[in-house]
């Protein structure tokens, strides 16, 4: 016995210097054996002698107590080999201990370093006063605490056990309710190298015991609950752990034992695996809760398909354990259960362990996702059929959505803005691809096939466009209002023309009214011929009878003679240059134009500038009723009175007069220096302007010129006898007005406001553009009446300056 004590002391010294000490301790107590058996069992207890972790006393115990307290295999299962103790980390490594083994972090985990070294000491604890019931076992074996996650059959341990296992610094105290509150002995195990005290409290040996046979027959496990920082094993029995006080076994609780490297390795591995699995499951539950089902929110899936959701069916629980007891079905809301840290012993009372075939996971829960390096099973293996069904539903809904969108785009293509349709006709846009989002981005001020504008730029441009459109709208409203007023005014003036003609246009009051109204409204077709005739020669018509050759006579002369071919060619060329190649050529040219020019060429006055234009416009104007005689008389009358030699001469002088009105305006712009001369500004080039004037404006211009050359024949009548046998020069000096101002103001208006597309009044006749017109028509913006009215008002403005 003394040798054993010395040997144990020597072993204690060696344990402090050894890096990893092999733990092999087994305390066997049998209340039914004799003192000799107790002494023999005491000798079999480890006294600090190094032992292999694989040595198991199960065989020897089975030989001694085989079959005496057998445990039913239906409810109990054998625990695996011990892997490690619940230990505390030393603040400092023990001398000659392995620092690398304890701190090398072989398995990266938040729990890999916790309690990787330490020792377990067996101490007695007084727990009888705490309400805990000590259970006296026939045979009590204290050894390395198993921390394996799996049972021997490979089934999973519940999370409740894992959670209890993670808290390694505290081992729960087991409380077993029983009718008998008396205790023999209680043992308390506290981890840590500083814990070396062992206390043993002897209790009444006659206390009531738990019959092992009763435990065997019932096969049920008493309930238990965890406690922190200590683990107490309370047993009910009639015999103590040590039958002899002088036994060397009494000093065993004072012995300090450490975990071996393999035990620490297994413990760290189990902690890493447990932590990793818990983390994976928590993340899976989190993402399953956070992931929304957008397709169901769209309402595109029928209610009959709602059942087809990706979840595990009953066929996917092959990897789970069948639950024989519904009480042990795993639930996240259930109360955590501790892992019972006791190795199975056939000779002891059954320890508290989940029964065989108990389920650690809920078979209704989703299967865990595969973990790289741990599980090689694919998660798609369990939901393959479900994913195929969902894929078909998604494809079907996608096709249905595509068809509906295509039909919607096709219908909306008919009501798209005009710019998209124009771009589609040019091949620059596909109407089916135009969505509502594109309509919001595309700007009307930029083609749709170009990159869209910046939002701020688009907003700025739209504001400017809106402002311009507003101004244009107001202007258009003003023009519309003005057009209505002008239309009313024209109707009123036309009625006044008729009244004035009935009353007599040669009266002074009538002439003043005419000179005012003619700038507002042109003469009507019905009144033009009569007013021209009365204003230029009064009712006496002395000029037509005495100074204009009769149309019948000149016609007879032309019929009797053979008109020279070269003269005829010159007349045709004149028609082409002055009429056909100009804006007037757009109208129908009368077949009698050549005849009228031939007659004029053989007359006493001959062809003079402007004859071709006057004949052409009067032949096409309904006011003359296409009467050749009326046209003949009217053209000659205008040439003799309005464009006589005195008027032309006066115009040629005043148009280039250095101190005149025209010079005053043109001298303000240096660009008119090359144009302000007699070669460019004369009575002949004046007619070049009229070649570029359309018919309606030409007739209005003639109306103004005729009214400007009118006389008050009512107060100063023409005496036929006075001018009988008098020459035209005499009559002209007495009864013809020289009115050059209206002609000069007309030319000044064109030079200042309509000098576009030509260099001077000479080159204007040589322009090849047949459609060139003064003023230029703007059919898309303004009507012809408005443009002509603006031209006349500007002309009136300059006419008043003379």
From Swiss-Prot:
Which residue stretches belong to region Disordered? 207-230, 323-345
Lipoprotein keyword on record: no
Subcellular compartments: Cytoplasm; Golgi apparatus
- Gene Ontology annotations for the cellular component aspect, listed alphabetically: Golgi apparatus
The reply to whether DNA-binding figures as a keyword in the UniProt entry is no
Q: One Pfam family, short name please?
A: SBE2_C
Q: Note the InterPro entries from the entry.
A: Sbe2/Sbe22_C, SBE2/SBE22_M, SBE2/SBE22_N
- Keyword set for this entry? Cell wall biogenesis/degradation, Cytoplasm, Golgi apparatus, Protein transport, Transport
Q: Which GO terms describe its biological process?
A: fungal-type cell wall organization; protein transport
The similarity annotation says:
Belongs to the SBE2 family.
* Protein name as it appears in the record: Protein SBE22
Name its species. Vanderwaltozyma polyspora (strain ATCC 22028 / DSM 70294 / BCRC 21397 / CBS 2163 / NBRC 10782 / NRRL Y-8283 / UCD 57-17) (Kluyveromyces polysporus)
- Taxonomy of the source species: Eukaryota, Fungi, Dikarya, Ascomycota, Saccharomycotina
Name of the gene: SBE22
